[in-house]
A protein has these predicted regions:
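Acidic, Ser/Thr/Pro
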Residues: 2-165
Length: 165
């Protein structure tokens, strides 16, 4: 190769390497921010929950981690419940029920809708306040959308992800 062709070859290879490195770094930054949200007051985000009825045992979960004390309203379901918890928030009936399972059977206990708790009922969903990390069971037979809305007067920072298993 002549000197000029060699110089152009090295320049082209250098630009290719620089472009690849920049693309990889951009993808890394994009992946790091996946599922992280900051909502201003009144803003909302929609998360799609897909049904996997063709699977024998399918399961959908909403993983929510709040990083501040702002209030978020979760809507789009008739009822809400956390994994590992016996408390069910029924939006349709506007009731909170604790299910107590013992060797004698199952007992249901109605709980008051206390707005000082970390989770309470609203007319069309539940409100989550304070720093919290919870996993909500969101399995349904048909696909639907969960809406997360900032109902506070300050910005809300959180991570939310729907996992379909």
């Amino acid at each position: 190769m002549t000197y000029r062709k060699n110089k152009i070859w090295k320049l082209g290879c250098g630009l290719l390497i620089l472009t690849l490195a920049t693309s990889i770094f951009g993808l890394y930054l994009w992946a790091q921010n996946l599922g992280k949200y900051t909502l201003q007051p009144g803003q909302s985000v929609e998360l799609k929950v897909f049904s996997k009825t063709e699977q024998l045992e399918y399961n959908s979960e909403l993983i929510l981690e709040k990083k501040d004390d702002a209030k978020l309203k979760l809507s789009g379901r008739k009822g809400w419940g956390m994994k590992g918890s016996n408390t069910v928030y029924n939006v349709e009936k506007q009731s909170i029920t604790e299910i107590i399972i013992s060797k004698d059977g199952t007992e249901r206990k109605d709980l008051p809708n206390d707005k000082s708790k970390s989770i309470y009922l609203e007319s069309d969903g539940i409100v989550v306040q304070g720093e919290i990390k919870d996993v909500f069971g969101v399995t349904e037979e048909t696909s639907y959308t969960i809406t997360i809305t900032n109902v506070d007067d300050k910005p809300a920072h959180f991570e939310a992800q729907v996992v379909d298993r």
